[in-house]
Amino acid sequence: KYAAKISVDTSSIQYENDEVMKPEWGDDYSICCCVSATKTGQEIQLFGARANLAKTLLYAFNGGFDEKHRIQCGPKMERITSEYADYDEVIEKFDWWMDWLADIYVNVLNLIHYMHDKYYYEAAEMALINNDCERSFATGIAGFSHVVDSLSAIKYAKVKIIRDEEGITKDFEIEGDFPRYGNDDPRADELATWLLRTFFDKIRRRHTYRDSKPSTSILTITSNVVYGEATGATPDGRYAHTPVADGVSPSAGKDVNGPTAAATSVSRLDHFIVSNGTLFNQKFHPSALAGREGLEKFVALIRTFFDQKGMHMQFNVVSRETLLDAQAHPENYKHLVVRVAGYSALFT
């Protein structure tokens, strides 16, 4: 309850679930980077960039043609040419492109880690690690919720494909309703589980640098802005070149059934697969957590999420009006703290 009160007052705390961490990392683990666990003094984490699966889904529609840069980025494959997206066809092509991406992704990370060891070996840091250390090969996923929602839209609604004069998919029109990730709907959450397991299965089938143990994460930190800028419109209704959702959080504004429903959807993911970490952001207006009753409900939310085997959650407790006023008058908010990702920062 004391920690929750600090969250309400300062937005400066993140919560990690021991019961999820211990089976993989043991009792003596540390948090490295932002939210990832590591065996203290016994492990090296080889980390690299994230795989933008939202962009990969668009490659499935356009046969590897990049809708933004107007170049062929992958093998020239058959495009989806139907007026409406067919779920089975999309899944088949998307699965192929995820396999292609996993191969390139792991090979590039292998090269990065080899060159890092060759030209920037961290001798001082290595002196603090056991000789017989473990090595984890950390990968990551970006655009997660948008892919889940896109597949759900194609499966449960009708998605019309909008193409430019060259036949390249540039936008989508959705007809009908569909379940979205983050609303405690098993239909969407099953697609989320499928996506995570399918892509990670492709990662761990590849040879990794120094036979390190593959792991994955869904923790974009702030890179979701950059990945979104590089990605066209997606079938879930997200506009072209706008940020993708941060970390494992639902798409912005689409978790309409409340924080408990969003937390339940996130907790349904197999966090022993995504062992390198998930980053789950939630935002509250201060009035929602005011007083003793508000604080007790807040504590109950955190405990319930962890009881459901969720891994990580953090909160921004600040009003929109405060943030807008801080933008306009930063001199009045020199001590305003916001939770960015796995770290806090002064807003101004």
Regions found by a protein language model. Name each.
Residues K1-T348:
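Conserved catalytic cores of very large enzyme subunits
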